Structures are given as structure tokens and as C-alpha cells.
A protein has these predicted regions:
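Active-site-proximal helices and loops of the catalytic beta/alpha 8
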Residues: 1-40, 62, 71, 90-115, ...
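Active-site clefts of carbohydrate-active enzymes
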Residues: 35-59
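Conserved, mostly hydrophobic/aromatic
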Residues: 47, 72, 84, 116, ...
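Short catalytic/ligand-binding loop motif for oxyanion handling, primarily in non-cytosolic enzymes
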Residues: 50-53, 88-93, 161-163
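Short acidic/histidine-rich active-site segments
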Residues: 80-87
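Carbohydrate-binding surface patches
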Residues: 134-168
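Beta-strand-rich binding/interaction modules
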Residues: 161-181
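C-terminal beta-strand-rich structural cap/linker in extracellular carbohydrate-active enzymes
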Residues: 186-201
């Protein structure tokens, strides 16, 4: 296992306006170069990046940071949370200096990260399932499947409403968003709010 630096670089560019489908290409390129059974560690910040900028700033706000995290850990790879990102700490942290962090500052952000890591650990399909990509300019769309588990994941990488086409095999299905518990019926397209993500089963 090593850091997925290339994917992280593409992730940053996508959230600044590059096509969401670039992430699908970056994911494939990283994994095509790996031996079977090996993984890349996916992240939105680490000990190097935290000295420069925190995810809640780099990806516009807390909602953008969460969307970026979903786009980072669920296509492939190991999931990294770097200390302080789970509470949305807004300032750079020098790795070599003591920096006090208010761990109770944003309990909603903490709970959201906790939920996502819980889903990652609970569902083999999300953690290591086979991925089927559906390229789009503004929404990252892909399926994950392992055995009987079948998920459709959508991440709006823009800070504005975007409409995206639903893969035909999912149209008409009743699904549940595992992130919120909300149930919905999928039509041919869905409008997503700024930085919204859906983990549908």
C-alpha cells in the first residue's frame, strides 16, 4: 500500500472545474499499474497537505470536503482520515509544531465522517467491489458490486445544482441512500444539490 498521489492531484483539479470523469481515468491508471491484491491509500489530506490547506478550505467548504472524501475512498483503495479533518479544522497544521484543535467544534462533520467510514467497513462492495464507471462532466457516477451487494454512487463535484443521467439498469428501482436512510425511486435523471453525494443500494 502507498499513497494515491496521482488520484489526489486529479481530485483537486476536478473540484476546481475539470471534468468529473477525469477521476475515473485516474483511478483506472493507478490500479492498472498495481500488482493484484495491492491498494492505493486514498485521501483528501495527509501530513504533507495539512501544512498547506485543510480540506474544508481546499474543497470550498465542509460539504465540498465531504463530497471529495466520498469521491476519494469509494472508487478503490484504502481510506485515510488525517487528524483534524474529521472536525473540519480550517487552519493549516504544521506537522512539527503543537497545534491545539477543538475536537468538539463541528460534531456534525465528525458524525458524517464516522458514518462514511462505518459504511466503508461494513460493506465489502464499497470497500473492494468491482467498479463500473459512468463518465459525466459534473457528477462522479459509478457502481460497486460484490456478491449480492450492489451500490450506485453519485457525487456532485460542483458547488451548484447539477442534473445527471441515471444508468439505465437502475432506472425505475426503489433504492435507499445509505448515507441518510432516505428512500427514493430512480427516474432517468436526478438533480443533485451543491456537493451532494448519494450512496444508493
Amino acid at each position: 500500500m502507498n499513497y494515491g498521489w496521482d488520484y489526489k492531484d486529479v481530485l483537486s483539479k476536478v473540484f476546481k472545474g475539470n471534468p468529473a470523469s477525469d477521476l475515473l481515468e485516474a483511478d483506472k491508471a493507478e490500479y492498472d499499474s498495481l500488482p493484484d491484491g495491492k491498494v492505493k491509500l486514498r485521501f483528501t489530506t495527509n501530513h504533507d497537505h495539512a501544512t498547506e490547506v485543510e480540506p474544508c478550505i481546499q474543497f470550498t467548504n465542509d460539504h465540498g470536503a465531504m463530497a471529495a472524501y466520498v469521491a476519494s475512498i469509494f472508487p478503490h483503495g484504502g481510506a485515510l482520515i488525517y487528524g483534524s479533518q474529521e472536525v473540519g479544522y480550517p487552519e493549516p497544521i504544521n506537522f512539527f509544531k503543537y497545534v491545539p484543535v477543538d475536537w468538539s467544534a463541528k460534531p456534525d462533520v465528525y458524525q458524517e465522517y464516522k458514518k462514511l467510514i462505518g459504511l466503508y467497513n461494513e460493506h465489502p462492495a464499497l470497500r473492494k467491489g468491482t467498479m463500473t464507471p459512468y463518465p459525466d462532466n459534473d457528477v462522479l457516477v459509478f457502481e460497486k458490486q460484490d456478491g449480492d451487494e450492489h451500490f450506485l454512487i453519485l457525487v456532485n463535484v460542483r458547488n451548484e445544482n447539477k442534473t445527471v443521467q441515471i444508468p439505465q439498469s437502475w432506472v425505475g428501482h426503489e433504492v435507499e441512500d445509505e448515507a441518510t436512510g432516505k428512500e427514493l425511486r430512480l427516474n432517468e435523471a436526478i438533480e443533485m444539490e451543491p456537493f451532494e453525494y448519494l450512496i444508493l443500494e
